[in-house]
């Protein structure tokens, strides 16, 4: 499971139901709890018989850092000038090394380890790349592998790994 998109889904869901509190630190537990509920729902829907690998984006490769930085500045600029509605949650907190991501990593690890493998945001690399490294290192020819994530890179990486038989991408 490439889980960064699930973080954003959880924040949007709490925001729509007016459960997202103005104080950022007060949002850590509700977001983390909802995220774990959603992860469990995906696990229940997929019904894995073997391993579950839960990945969050860690520190990105240097080449991608400028892209991420400009995306964050653009969002802040658009919010500041009321082009897009202000959020009660600063999405820049969904960055490796922030208090929020450190809290979330510990929360998810406590909830799902040791039963499942959790590659938290303190482990470098984007979630989808960590997933495929795990597949390359551990894939068995007769094993079905289901990958969840909304990142466009996930589809490209899946195509590049088509030599791995029985590889499926689960998306909504």
What would you call each of these model-derived segments?
Residues 1-172:
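Noncatalytic, typically N-terminal accessory segments of nucleic acid-processing enzymes
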